[in-house]
Each structure stands twice: as C-alpha cells, then as structure tokens.
Amino acid sequence: MNNLKAHYQKTIAKELQKSFAFSSIMQVPRLEKIVINMGVGDAIRDSKFLESALNELHLISGQKPVATKAKNAISTYKLRAGQLIGCKVTLRGERMWAFLEKLIYVALPRVRDFRGLSLKSFDGRGNYTIGIKEQIIFPEIVYDDIKRIRGFDVTLVTSTNKDSEALALLRALNLPLVKG
C-alpha cells in the first residue's frame, strides 16, 4: 500500500472527521481521481508532436493516455472538428496515490522559484487544478529525449463539493499550498 494512502486512512480521515464534525467516516472528503490533461496545439501541423506528448504522458503517469479531439472547428487556427489536439489520462486507485506522492515529494520541489501553489485554483466544487509549465520536473522525462518543453494540467477531484473541505484535505496530504 502507498505511504500517502496509508497515512490518509490511518490519520487524516479521522482528523478531518473530528474537525468538520462528520457523523460518519464516509462523509469525510477523499481523493476520487486525478486527471492529467495535455493540450498539444502543434498537433494541428504535425502529428509527431502528439505522439511524443502521448509518450511523455505515459511515462509521467504510468498509464496509457487517450488522445482528445477538438469539439468545434476554429478557422483562425486551421482546426477541424474531430481533429486530435491533445491527450489526457485519468488515474484512480493505487496509481493515483503513487502519482500524487511523486508530484508532492519529487516533482514540485524541482520547479524553479517554487513558492507554493495558489489557493485560487479551486473550481468552487471542491476540485483543485495545478498548471505545470514544464514536463521535465518529473524524473521519468529525460531532458535530451524531448522535442519541446510543454506543460499540462493536473486536476485533483475530491468527493466533496465545498472548497473549504477540499482545502483541508489537500493541506493534510501535504500539498504545498500558499498560506492564506
């Protein structure tokens, strides 16, 4: 079992139950899934960019990503509906906990000039999105093998609909959020 998951089950869940006065342990907010999304605008011109993005996302997440298609046609970008323009992967269970642990303790400390994550990234429904500017902060990515530095979004989806409960959960999981 993952260290972070064991810590959540043994201590964090009980602490959150006491602090929010939940009558049942099942009411305690928990992490449901992590969605990693990478938009590849260059895939319009050359599909090799999408292939390299799929490979990088596979290395980072440990799970095969799925290519995403454009919903609408946008003539200014020469984009047609149904054209492949990105990739995403949804992590649940053990892979989710392993990725979160790697993100918190390995990747985020490698970000240059890192001062913590903003509290403004909550969506109002208890979900938190982190924008990562460079994929090279992950140890699986070899700097010499990448064609282009690209970023991606990591969305932490929680079981609660309140940002305050999700904030307490993420702070308890040691996500480096800015004091506020």
UniProtKB/Swiss-Prot annotation:
List the PANTHER family hit by this protein, alphabetically.
Answer: 60S RIBOSOMAL PROTEIN L11-RELATED
The organism encoding this protein is Mycoplasma pneumoniae (strain ATCC 29342 / M129 / Subtype 1)
Q: Does the keyword Signal apply?
A: no
Task of the protein: This is one of the proteins that bind and probably mediate the attachment of the 5S RNA into the large ribosomal subunit, where it forms part of the central protuberance. In the 70S ribosome it contacts protein S13 of the 30S subunit (bridge B1b), connecting the 2 subunits; this bridge is implicated in subunit movement. Contacts the P site tRNA; the 5S rRNA and some of its associated proteins might help stabilize positioning of ribosome-bound tRNAs.
What is this protein identified as?
Large ribosomal subunit protein uL5
GO-annotated cellular components: ribonucleoprotein complex; ribosome
NCBIfam families, per this entry? PRK00010.1
List, in alphabetical order, the Gene Ontology terms for molecular function in this entry. Answer: rRNA binding; structural constituent of ribosome; tRNA binding
**Any one biological process term the GO annotation gives:** translation
Does this UniProt record's set of keywords contain DNA repair? Answer: no
| SUPFAM superfamilies, sorted | RL5-like (SSF55282)
Keyword annotations of the record: Ribonucleoprotein, Ribosomal protein, RNA-binding, rRNA-binding, tRNA-binding
User: What protein family is recorded?
Assistant: Belongs to the universal ribosomal protein uL5 family.
Q: Tell me the name of the encoding gene.
A: rplE
Subunit structure as annotated in this protein's UniProt entry: Part of the 50S ribosomal subunit; part of the 5S rRNA/L5/L18/L25 subcomplex. Contacts the 5S rRNA and the P site tRNA. Forms a bridge to the 30S subunit in the 70S ribosome.
Q: Which residues form a coiled coil?
A: none
